[in-house]
């Protein structure tokens, strides 16, 4: 079968990951001890995408948990599904990265990375036909960003032909957890551009807004935010795990969503999101799911798709519905909002339908979009980066771990290049395509003046 190895790193990644296994285990009818007590054969048919079957019919997640301090791991282990994981797959150091990307990437993380790779290798060897890796981490801290990107580049070397998908929590515009977030995030994006295949961009502020405005939660906790992320993660892989009329997998997703290799940063959305009180007042229909999916308020990262254009998008529906209706709706969206889609990619929405809906819903939809508006995220982080870097603020923490200022400069210009690439394709029209071909290598050059 097409297995996925799940890797979670750092506090944020571990907390999202722990929640993810609760959601997935619930879908497959696996209880916290790893025993199956579901009610349908379909739950078991492809359970081995995410689980290994151990002796005595126990199901063990294909998960690798890593952190540079034991704290979060202990709380995962003490959590509701803590006994599910294989004890050897917890890999942790004792020192912590202290929100320092250099510690995660070069010093502390580099010492621990080999033991993490051993565990990853073991998990990969137990797969029949490994499809790829999914990583949950944040870009603002030290471990998830520094060590996470180190691990991604190492896995890239060892498994160059496997899909590398990351769920990356980016720094929010208004809420900042760490002062040095812009540094850590920029250095991470620099790595993700080169080494990841698909990056799902999330950020806490957008998730808060969804919890607050749409779900009407007065005091959203991180648990609520993580639950939103996990529903999306589960939706993206649903057609691998359950039978469907129109299947999608990680590779198909990549092929349909990435027109140019560097532009692989996606937005996520999910429908139906309704507050607990008003659920029973609305009937779920394919048109309603579609319109909520494409709603800007529904995006799980702080970039407004109305400020850019979609290069490509993908909608994964779950539940009993006619594929004809899905296709009509997709066409409908493109025709009504044609100005928000680039015209030089004619059919830019991919859809897939999986027959089994998530627990407690009749039907649902997961949205993954490749929009040029995502540059807002990078622009914002880039501006904060430049402001601090110009004064060399906090730089001694990084150079003290053996980093060079040159690396910061490179990361900065790589991110600026990324922004201008998105901008270039946002402005491109079908007619003037010929103009780009001659000077295709040229558009990176004028950015280097931004230092």
Swiss-Prot record:
SMART domains assigned: Tubulin (SM00864), Tubulin_C (SM00865)
Q: Which cofactor does it need?
A: Mg(2+)
Where in the sequence does UniProt note compositional bias of the Polar residues kind?
417-427
Q: Name one Pfam family in it.
A: Tubulin_C
Cellular component GO terms, alphabetically?
A: cytoplasm; microtubule
Acidic residues: bias regions? 429-451
Keywords annotated in UniProt: Cytoplasm, Cytoskeleton, GTP-binding, Magnesium, Metal-binding, Microtubule, Nucleotide-binding
Binding sites annotated in the UniProt record for GTP: 11, 69, 138, 142-144, 204, 226
Q: Name one GO molecular function term.
A: structural constituent of cytoskeleton
- Compartments, as annotated in UniProt: Cytoplasm, Cytoskeleton
Major subcellular site: cytoplasm
Family designation: Belongs to the tubulin family.
Q: How does it assemble?
A: Dimer of alpha and beta chains. A typical microtubule is a hollow water-filled tube with an outer diameter of 25 nm and an inner diameter of 15 nM. Alpha-beta heterodimers associate head-to-tail to form protofilaments running lengthwise along the microtubule wall with the beta-tubulin subunit facing the microtubule plus end conferring a structural polarity. Microtubules usually have 13 protofilaments but different protofilament numbers can be found in some organisms and specialized cells.
The protein's name: Tubulin beta-4 chain
Organism, by scientific name, is Oomycete-like sp. (strain MacKay2000)
């Amino acid at each position: 079968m097409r297995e996925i190895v799940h890797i979670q790193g750092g506090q944020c990644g571990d907390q999202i990951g722990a929640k993810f296994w609760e959601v997935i285990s619930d879908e497959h009818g696996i209880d916290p001890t790893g025993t199956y007590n579901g009610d349908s054969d379909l739950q078991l048919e492809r359970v081995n995408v995410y689980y290994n079957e151990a002796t005595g019919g126990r199901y063990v997640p294909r998960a690798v948990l890593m952190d540079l301090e034991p704290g979060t791991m202990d709380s995962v282990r003490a959590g509701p599904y803590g006994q599910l994981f294989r004890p050897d797959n917890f890999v942790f150091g004792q020192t912590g990265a202290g929100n320092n990307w250099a510690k995660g990437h070069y010093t502390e993380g580099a010492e621990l990375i080999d033991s993490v790779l051993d565990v990853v290798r073991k998990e990969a060897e137990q797969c029949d036909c490994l499809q790829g890796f999914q990583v949950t981490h944040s870009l603002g801290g030290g471990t998830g960003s520094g060590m996470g990107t180190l691990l991604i580049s190492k896995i890239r070397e060892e498994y160059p032909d496997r899909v590398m998908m990351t769920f990356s929590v980016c720094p929010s515009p208004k809420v900042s957890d760490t002062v040095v977030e812009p540094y850590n995030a920029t250095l991470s994006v620099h790595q993700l551009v080169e080494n990841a295949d698909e990056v799902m961009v999330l950020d806490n502020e957008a998730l808060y807004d969804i919890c607050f405005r749409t779900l009407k939660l007065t005091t959203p906790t991180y648990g609520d935010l993580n639950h939103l992320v996990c529903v999306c993660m589960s939706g993206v892989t649903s057609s691998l795990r359950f039978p469907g009329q129109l299947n999608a997998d990680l590779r198909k997703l990549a092929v349909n969503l990435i027109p140019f290799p560097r532009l692989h940063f996606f937005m996520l959305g999910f429908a139906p999101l309704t507050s607990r009180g008003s659920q029973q007042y609305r009937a779920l229909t394919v048109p309603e799911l579609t319109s909520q999916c494409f709603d800007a308020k529904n995006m799980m990262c702080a970039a407004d798709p109305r400020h850019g254009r979609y290069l490509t998008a993908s909608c994964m529906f779950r539940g009993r519905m006619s594929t004809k209706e899905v296709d009509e709706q997709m066409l409908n969206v493109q025709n009504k909002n044609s100005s928000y889609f680039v015209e030089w990619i004619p059919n830019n929405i991919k859809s897939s339908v999986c027959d089994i809906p998530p627990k407690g819903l009749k039907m649902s939809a997961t949205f993954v979009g490749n929009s040029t508006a995502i540059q807002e995220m990078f622009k914002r982080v880039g501006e904060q980066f430049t402001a601090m870097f110009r004064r060399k603020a906090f730089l001694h923490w990084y150079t003290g771990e053996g980093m060079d200022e040159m690396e910061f400069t490179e990361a900065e210009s790589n991110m600026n290049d990324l922004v201008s690439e998105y901008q270039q394709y946002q402005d491109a029209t079908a007619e003037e395509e010929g103009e780009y071909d001659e000077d295709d290598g040229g558009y990176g050059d004028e950015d280097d003046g931004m230092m």
